[in-house]
Amino acid sequence: GFGALFKFL
């Protein structure tokens, strides 16, 4: 999911 991506940001 994109949630994990935002976690990195």
UniProtKB/Swiss-Prot annotation:
Would you tell me the Gene Ontology cellular component terms? extracellular region
Question: Which GO terms fall under molecular function for this chain's record?
Answer: toxin activity
Q: Which keywords, in A-to-Z order, does the entry hold?
A: Secreted, Toxin
Which lineage is the organism of this entry classified under, starting from the top rank? Eukaryota, Metazoa, Ecdysozoa, Arthropoda, Chelicerata
User: What family is it from?
Assistant: Belongs to the cationic peptide 04 (cupiennin) family. 03 subfamily.
Tell me yes or no: is Transport among this UniProt entry's keywords: no
Q: What is this protein called?
A: Short cationic peptide-1f
The lineage's top-level taxon is Eukaryota
Q: Where expressed (tissue)?
A: Expressed by the venom gland.
Where does the record place it? Secreted
The record lists the organism as: Cupiennius salei
